[in-house]
UniProtKB/Swiss-Prot annotation:
Marked site (Important for determining product chain length) residue numbers: 120
UniProt record, GO biological process: alcohol biosynthetic process; isoprenoid biosynthetic process; mycotoxin biosynthetic process
Source organism, top-level taxon: Eukaryota
Binding residues annotated for isopentenyl diphosphate, in chain numbering: 49, 52, 81, 98
SUPFAM superfamilies: Terpenoid synthases (SSF48576)
Keyword ATP-binding attached: no
Pathway: Secondary metabolite biosynthesis
Name under which the protein is recorded: Geranylgeranyl pyrophosphate synthase idtG
Organism annotation: Claviceps paspali
Cofactor annotation: Mg(2+)
Disruption phenotype: Simultaneous disruption of idtB, idtC, idtF and idtG eliminates the biosynthesis of the whole spectrum of indole-diterpenes reported to be produced by C.paspali, including paspaline, paxilline, paspalinine, paspalitrem A and paspalitrem B.
First-level EC class: transferase
Length: 334
């Protein structure tokens, strides 16, 4: 039978085998048009550290949700996380993600946006498999939060407005905390436990983002995966950058470097040296240590209430995020 001119027959190659592998893991795929999911599949071919999946498993030691529901929730978070990365890389004009060229440099901006949008709705479709009637409302709530956070970060960059630390913290709670919270709120909705784990999740989300900001400017491993000091080239007001600018309000050098969105190696090295001269990396490390200590205290309180030993997996995640325990080069990036 000849291929239809309306429904072309696509070549079955390496990408198709990737989709089959993903499907075996329980991830939804689009059977009719493999090109629809190609950017998403490409990103999944270079998996990150999957810390969100690890956190879901760790919190489930307390919540005891049935495995089939956990798998569904992890699938939802995986789809949303990878979709958000596709969009982030376009908005930030990124060059590398996980050590390979970004998806839109391979498939084009339009197709990558469409693939990301499709993933949002594939994730939404998965909500039908959950028993909590509030799952859709939770999903909508946290996706709105995620876009609020992303919108504020983009606004600061485009208007060259340096936010306060308080404004930055609110942005992080929305942007980074959104998916962390979504996973745990969906878990809580499937659990018999009435204990609220969101405060600890919020601490972990903030810890993760500030650590990520630090790594972007200080980690050799991070540079290999995303490029040297990518946040400087993006003009991003990250945590150490905000502290550095506000440490010397009358000095416009760093602000002007961000304005240039420079890819020049020497300019970026100068920016890192300037940030270091204001004590901002030291300040950042102190904040990370403080958040890690607070998260450990929150976890200890939960273990005291729920029973010792349930927090072993969460403690392992905290060790991974702890700069002193893991070393500053440890990479937990997306």
């Amino acid at each position: 039978m000849a291929p239809s001119p309306i429904m072309p027959r696509y070549h079955v190659g390496p990408m198709a085998s990737t989709r089959r592998a993903i499907s075996k893991k329980g991830f939804p795929r689009t059977r009719s048009f493999p090109v629809l999911t190609a950017p998403l599949d490409y990103l999944r071919d270079s998996p990150g550290k999957d810390i969100r999946s690890g956190l879901t498993d760790a919190f489930n030691e307390f919540l005891c949700v049935p495995e089939d529901k956990v798998v569904t929730i992890k699938r939802i978070i995986d789809l949303l996380h990878n979709a958000s990365l596709l969009i982030d890389d376009i908005q930030d004009d990124s060059k590398l993600r996980r050590g390979v060229p970004v998806a839109h440099s391979i498939f084009g901006i339009a197709q990558t946006i469409n693939s990301a949008n499709l993933a949002y709705f594939l994730a939404q479709q998965e909500l039908k498999k959950l028993s909590n009637p509030d799952a859709f409302a939770i999903y909508t709530d946290e996706l709105i939060n995620l876009h609020r956070g992303q919108g504020m970060e983009l606004h600061w960059r485009e208007s060259l407005h340096c936010p306060t630390e308080e404004e930055y913290m609110r942005m992080v709670q929305n942007k980074t905390g959104g998916l962390f919270r979504l996973a745990i709120r969906l878990l809580q909705g499937e659990s018999r436990s009435d204990r609220d784990y969101v405060p600890l999740v919020d601490t972990l989300g903030t810890l993760f983002q500030i650590r990520d900001d630090y790594q972007n400017l200080q980690s050799d491993v991070y540079s290999k995966n995303k490029g040297f000091c990518e946040d400087i080239s993006e003009g991003k007001f990250s945590y150490p950058v905000i502290h550095s600018i506000r440490a010397r309000p009358g000095d416009l050098r760093l602000l002007n470097i961000l304005k240039q969105r420079s890819e020049d190696l020497m300019v970026k090295q100068y920016a890192v040296s300037y940030i270091n001269s204001t004590g901002s990396f030291e300040f950042c490390r102190g904040k990370i240590d403080c958040l890690a200590q607070w998260a450990n205290l929150q976890l200890a309180a939960l273990e005291e209430a729920e029973g010792a030993g349930r927090g072993d997996k969460l403690r392992a995640v905290l060790r991974l995020l702890d700069m002193k325990a893991s070393g500053k080069q440890a990479d937990v990036a997306s």
